[in-house]
Amino acid sequence: MKLPARVFFTLGSRLPCGLAPRRFFSYGTKILYQNTEALQSKFFSPLQKAMLPPNSFQGKVAFITGGGTGLGKGMTTLLSSLGAQCVIASRKMDVLKATAEQISSQTGNKVHAIQCDVRDPDMVQNTVSELIKVAGHPNIVINNAAGNFISPTERLSPNAWKTITDIVLNGTAFVTLEIGKQLIKAQKGAAFLSITTIYAETGSGFVVPSASAKAGVEAMSKSLAAEWGKYGMRFNVIQPGPIKTKGAFSRLDPTGTFEKEMIGRIPCGRLGTVEELANLAAFLCSDYASWINGAVIKFDGGEEVLISGEFNDLRKVTKEQWDTIEELIRKTKGS
């Protein structure tokens, strides 16, 4: 193979979503670059069935915030199908009632609905009292209530910042502390699970209030895992990557522009599913995971490790291009 006099390696910084991919190798006027489709997804087909045995949560009480839609609805559906008595909470009572009736009919187990704005500590206190009254002390607590939207940070008002942090951080704290105190009084344990995001750890522009608040949720969960284990309570976190739900995508990708970009940076080649997340959540809240405490589980198809590695975009280089590169490297050895 005839080689050019020079090859320029231009490993630049990542371009914003929606822009043309950067050039990796310049071969004269020809760009050595390979577009890749997410064909690898065929190796990672999602399973839709329940992972745990039937009746794994028989006799258990589960409390799920944000349980009326999306991920919360998916987790509630699975827990109820496995025998749990579920209580769901959110601000929209009409949505909650419809979800509770649908899941109850589907699984044959009663699902209770309680209206609650987690930003209001008095309302949270009343909700927990009603929860205990209708179902008993919870064995499972899933903090799933969330709020988020994309915006340049310099455009955020104090109220916009407060709205997100009040729901995500303060709301999770109010629910966790109120239920925790009641469990301590009753000398009962429970498994707590919080749903955050991978950028709670890495940080991310344009969702700064959410990233900050969810990082706080993770710190709180790990701290309570250390402090309240003596009371029989476990605290774990799931960091989901992109999972297509109507609510989240309507705010974070309203035009559908970025979905292909998202898939392109996931090694498994597809978005996650609600059912997969529900299976992971159910496992972490089950007795099968009784020795898992203080864990933060990434659930992102490998997205974070791909975008974090400086040279991971070399996956787009073809075998023929690698042959060229290898020959060039051999020629320059010792120079």
Swiss-Prot record:
The active site is at residue 199. NADP(+) binds at residues 66-71, 91, 117, 214, 240-243. It holds the Pfam family adh_short_C2. One of its GO terms (cellular component) is catalytic complex. GO terms for molecular function: 2,4-dienoyl-CoA reductase (NADPH) activity; identical protein binding; NADPH binding. The modification Phosphothreonine is found at residue 69. It is found in: Mitochondrion. Substrate binds at residues 91, 119, 149, 157, 251. Keywords: Acetylation, Fatty acid metabolism, Lipid metabolism, Mitochondrion, NADP, Oxidoreductase, Phosphoprotein, Transit peptide. SUPFAM superfamilies: NAD(P)-binding Rossmann-fold domains. It is an enzyme of class 1 (oxidoreductase). Its main location: mitochondrion. It catalyses: a (2E,4E)-dienoyl-CoA + NADPH + H(+) = a 4,5-saturated-(3E)-enoyl-CoA + NADP(+); a (2E,4Z)-dienoyl-CoA + NADPH + H(+) = a 4,5-saturated-(3E)-enoyl-CoA + NADP(+); (2E,4E)-hexadienoyl-CoA + NADPH + H(+) = (3E)-hexenoyl-CoA + NADP(+). Residues 1-34 form a transit peptide. Auxiliary enzyme of beta-oxidation. It participates in the metabolism of unsaturated fatty enoyl-CoA esters having double bonds in both even- and odd-numbered positions in mitochondria. Catalyzes the NADP-dependent reduction of 2,4-dienoyl-CoA to yield trans-3-enoyl-CoA. It is linked to 2,4-dienoyl-CoA reductase deficiency: A rare, autosomal recessive, inborn error of polyunsaturated fatty acids and lysine metabolism, resulting in mitochondrial dysfunction. Affected individuals have a severe encephalopathy with neurologic and metabolic abnormalities beginning in early infancy. Laboratory studies show increased C10:2 carnitine levels and hyperlysinemia. Homotetramer. This is 2,4-dienoyl-CoA reductase [(3E)-enoyl-CoA-producing], mitochondrial. It comes from Homo sapiens.
